[in-house]
């Protein structure tokens, strides 16, 4: 039996089979979980096609985390497939073009607000939408995907600020929902060549930094180590870990300039 045997997991953010979210869903299934995916808008048809590449094709529910109606009906839709949730994966992030690329001082509030709403506040929104489904006596684990926000990265700009907000949001959720045995942890992955990464100006600069400085060899085309960490955090191996950031970045976060 796998480490997620008998567990039900909701995974957001699956868009291509190169994404970390896809590999979380794949590894979770291989470890025994039943997986439900979310997507929305024009991406729905893409996610449904990609779902067929999983070991077991997973249902895809529509969810825009900025849409209150979608959030309100999420638990009802999930119950059509599984009776409860043991794990939730937050793989959601977006910043308008004006909030990236070295334009930090000139970015206007509406663009900043969009980045923070979609990338950070949505962790709280998604959690509260799923909370009625966290009924297992063993509690539930919410895992988010992060990019280290301890430092200011070139051209990452307001997305870096949004990731810092995500990290803080995770800690406050861990504080407030720990008494209900709901855990919150983030996986801070190194750069991975995903569709989302392609939209970040200067992504190649991240790759060169990792190639030259990370103690462990880093492969920007391999999302599996980050996916395995996320799955482990939803397993019985981490029942007393919450409010934590697990770095899966080849160790670069620990190295000075």
Give names to the regions the model predicted.
Residues 2-37:
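Canonical Rossmann dinucleotide-binding motif of NAD(H)/NADP(H)-dependent dehydrogenases/reductases
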Residues 11, 89, 143, 184-187, ...:
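Hydrophobic structural elements of the Rossmann-like NAD(P)H-binding subdomain
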Residues 50, 158, 179, 191-215, ...:
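A glycine/serine/threonine-rich, flexible loop-to-helix segment
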Residues 51-69:
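Rossmann-fold cofactor-recognition segment
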Residues 66-81:
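Conserved Rossmann-fold cofactor-binding substructure of NAD(P)-dependent oxidoreductases
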Residues 75, 123, 127, 170-171, ...:
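Short-chain dehydrogenase/reductase
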Residues 121, 179, 186, 205-241, ...:
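C-terminal helical subdomain
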């Amino acid at each position: 039996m796998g480490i997620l045997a008998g567990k039900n997991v909701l995974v957001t953010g699956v868009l291509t089979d190169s994404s970390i979210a896809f590999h979380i869903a794949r590894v979770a299934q291989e470890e025994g979980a039943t997986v439900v995916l979310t997507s929305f808008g024009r991406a729905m048809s893409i996610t449904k096609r990609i779902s067929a590449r999983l070991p077991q094709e997973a249902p895809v529910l529509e969810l825009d985390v900025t849409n209150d109606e979608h959030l309100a009906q999420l638990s009802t839709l999930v119950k059509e497939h599984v009776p409860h949730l043991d794990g939730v994966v937050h793989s959601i992030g977006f910043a308008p073009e004006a909030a990236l690329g070295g334009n930090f001082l000139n970015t206007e509030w509406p663009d900043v607000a969009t980045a923070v709403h979609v990338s950070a506040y949505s962790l709280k929104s998604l959690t509260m939408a799923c909370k009625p489904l966290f009924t297992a006596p063993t509690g539930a684990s919410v895992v988010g995907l992060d990019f280290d926000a301890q430092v200011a990265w070139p051209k990452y700009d307001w997305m870096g600020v949004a990731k810092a907000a995500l990290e803080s949001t995770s800690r406050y959720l861990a504080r407030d929902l720990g008494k209900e045995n709901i855990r919150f942890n983030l996986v801070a992955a190194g750069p991975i060549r995903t569709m989302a990464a392609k939209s970040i100006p200067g992504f190649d600069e991240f790759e060169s930094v990792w190639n030259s400085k990370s103690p462990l060899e880093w492969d920007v085309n391999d999302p599996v180590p980050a996916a395995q960490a996320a799955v482990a955090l939803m397993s019985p191996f981490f029942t007393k870990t919450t409010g934590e950031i697990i770095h899966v970045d080849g160790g670069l976060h620990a190295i000075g300039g």
